[in-house]
Amino acid sequence: MAKRTKKVGIVGKYGTRYGASLRKVVKKQEVSQHSKFFCDFCGKYGMKRKAVGIWSCKGCNKTKAGGAYSLNTGGSVTVRSTIRRLREATEK
């Protein structure tokens, strides 16, 4: 069978509806939410989305709260880097 969605990928299900720019934004979110992420607990790429904001690892069965479409949100990355920077400053 021929591959029908070479350019559009996962958003091919929407056809020509909703406009190209909106489908491009949705594609980024849907690819992110269906991909596997790195698990901080066991070190494997096994974190998958179970529901909105709930992520679980297939390797170690740990469940973690995260973002709606990706495991780490922009705010959580900023907070984590700030905490690490402050921790290193107090250790010196």
UniProtKB/Swiss-Prot annotation:
GO cellular component: ribonucleoprotein complex; ribosome
InterPro entries: Ribosomal_eL37/eL43, Ribosomal_eL43, Ribosomal_protein_eL43, Ribosomal_zn-bd
One of the GO BP terms on file: translation
Keywords: Metal-binding, Ribonucleoprotein, Ribosomal protein, Zinc, Zinc-finger
Coiled-coil stretches: none
Bridged cysteine pairs (disulfide): none
Segments forming C4-type zinc fingers: 39-60
Presence of keyword Zinc-finger: yes
Keyword Hydrolase: no
GO molecular function term, any single one: structural constituent of ribosome
Assigned protein family: Belongs to the eukaryotic ribosomal protein eL43 family.
Protein name as annotated: Large ribosomal subunit protein eL43
Taxonomic placement: Eukaryota, Viridiplantae, Chlorophyta, Mamiellophyceae, Mamiellales
